[in-house]
Design a protein with these regions (language model features):
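Conserved metal-binding segment of the jelly-roll/cupin
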Residues: 61-74
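Short loop segments at secondary-structure junctions
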Residues: 47-49, 72, 94
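An amphipathic alpha-helical interaction segment
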Residues: 123-174
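A hydrophobic/aromatic-rich effector-binding and dimerization subdomain
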Residues: 2-19, 74-140
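Generic protein-terminus/edge-of-domain signal
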Residues: 1-62, 106, 117
């Protein structure tokens, strides 16, 4: 692993380790430098085209498509030209664990966290609806129209639905 490329920016807080980042780029090229972190990340292209590289594989994401970055995977995002509007959702996998050492933890979440399992990086538009729901929660959190407990419960439910969809569609691989 390239320790010098580890992102040192803290994501979330102790009380709420889930982070949402919204990047809207109007017409000029940009690139988020190659990096890795311990959190699980979902990258969702709300509109436009986004170049995404995950573990050396490059993709062009278009409107409604999502990508998954497993903990520890090198990745970068950018756009050469044009306008892109995208979100990244980051969280430690233990955030959605029930911490009971049950089958979900033992057979899925812990292997995803340790790299023994991963979710295919490109999940196309499979997660569009769930990502849009996460954006709704992000907006409610910003304008404080819901309690912090409500937004956290809603977020965890959607993230568990995301993991379930990836499992059911065969996107979880060794």
């Amino acid at each position: 692993m390239y320790f010098e490329l580890k992102e040192n920016k803290p994501h979330g807080t102790k009380d709420d380790p889930f982070s949402t980042y919204h990047i809207e780029n109007a017409g000029r090229s940009f690139q988020i430098p190659v990096h890795w972190h311990d959190e699980f990340e979902i990258i969702y292209v709300r509109s436009g085209f986004l170049t995404v590289s995950i573990s050396g594989e490059s993709y062009i994401g278009k409107t409604g498509e999502a990508f998954v970055v497993s903990p520890g995977n090198l990745h970068l995002m950018g756009a050469q030209t044009g306008t892109v509007d995208y979100y990244t959702f980051l969280f430690p996998l233990k955030y959605i664990s029930f911490r009971t050492d049950d089958m979900l933890d033992e057979k899925l979440l812990e292997p995803l966290n340790s790299g023994h399992l991963m979710i295919c990086p490109r999940v196309k538009d499979t997660a569009k609806e769930l990502c849009e729901q996460l954006i709704e929660i992000y907006e409610a959190k910003k304008d404080e129209s819901e309690s912090k407990i409500t937004t956290q419960v809603r977020t965890k439910i959607i993230l568990l639905q995301f993991i379930l969809e990836m499992w059911k569609k065969g996107f979880v691989i060794e």
